[in-house]
Each structure stands twice: as C-alpha cells, then as structure tokens.
Amino acid sequence: MIPIAHIENDFPTKFGIPRQSGRVGALKARIVFEPEYRNVDACRGLEEFSHIWLIWEFSEAKRTKWSPTVRPPRLGGNVRKGVFATRSPFRPNSIGLSCVKLEKVALDEPDSPVLYVEGADLMNGTPIFDIKPYIPYADCHPEATGSFTEYSKDHHLNVEFPQELLERIPGESREALIAVLADDPRPAYQNDPERSYGMPFGEKDIHFRVDGDILRVYNVTEFVKKQQESRADCGK
C-alpha cells in the first residue's frame, strides 16, 4: 500500500502516545496529504462528518517475523494473548486503525486540503493509508464487550505540575499535555516510585515520577532528538 497522507503532532517518539484513540480528546493534530493525493475534490463532503477513521502503519514497530501471541502491557507484560485478540503493533501486517474527531477541513493553506483532528494516537510523521467517515448507525455498538481492556479504561493519575515548569510549555498545548500525563504514559508493568521518566512532547522533554496515583513533574527541558532511540515503548 502507498501512504496517502501523514500526521503532524506533538509526539516525536512512541513514548507517551495514548494507548487508544479518543482517550485524550484535547490532543490536536494535522493530517497532511502527500502531493499526489493533495486534491480538494477528494475531501468534498468530508466536513459533514464529525469523526473519521484513519488506517495507518505502525511504521516504528516493524518486525521481520511475527508471533501468534503477544503480551499486552495492560496485563502486566506477563500474560500472553493471541495477536488478533489485541491491538499490539507487532502484527503480521503492521496496520493501525483509529477513530478521531474531525475538527475542520482547511482549504486555504499552502498544502491544502489539511484535516485538523482531535484525539489521535499516532506518532508524528506516521504514514496514513486511507481515511473513511465514521458512520454512527453502523460503527457504534453500545452492547459491545471489551474483555481485558475493560480493566484499565478508567485508570487515571492525578498530575502535579508546578506552575513555573508548566509555563515552559506553549499555552495551547498545556491542556493536552496534562491529559496525556493523567492517562499514565508509563508501561503498565513499571510501578517503581523512584523511577524517573522522560516523555518528549513537542519540543520539550517532560521529566516525571509516579508514586501511587500521583504523577509529579519535576523538570521540563529541551527535547534532544538523539534521545529517541533510548525511549521506552508503551505499546498498545
């Protein structure tokens, strides 16, 4: 498949990305079409839908071999489930599926059409293979059950972010950042209160520790891109 677009957002690495789309609605992103598909007619009528589906590639999680079972982080990393019973990025075909809110379709920008979306769970630069409208009567199933994923859907942390550190974050990004931290960006099996984490967000590196249900930010520094290779991968 050939990418038709890519996403632009504040996640330069995999660490910290919400584990599911829609978990952090305050996250904003741009979807920019590749030149061959940059045609306003291709998006005609899309603005009439409130949400869209993104079909994309786990471009940073490719493997030459696949395993029939994986260990979901939310089960502590020790329990195996069939790969098709999870949303693990390590799949025979590294394809992701996300439902996001469509904020607007911009037609007056140099690289138009540009889609502004909220609640995406993709890394900056992720290639997108297709975009489809979300159809409520067909796509919504209130009676659906979610197996082991139900156990962590309400898990949140209380975030303590000193004002002097918060002021280092651009004003328009603060709400989204706090929501990402509250969603607990750590791998689920890491619970050491003395452990320090560094989460890249935009052009900053957010340093924090977690003790119980409290996440404390203790420093905000400039993000150095070469650090990317050493980041932990939260998975899905």
Predicted regions and their residues:
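Mixed-charge, low-complexity intrinsically disordered regions
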Residues: M1-I95, L107-Y116, A120-K236
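Conserved positions in beta-strands of structured domains
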Residues: E8, V100-E103
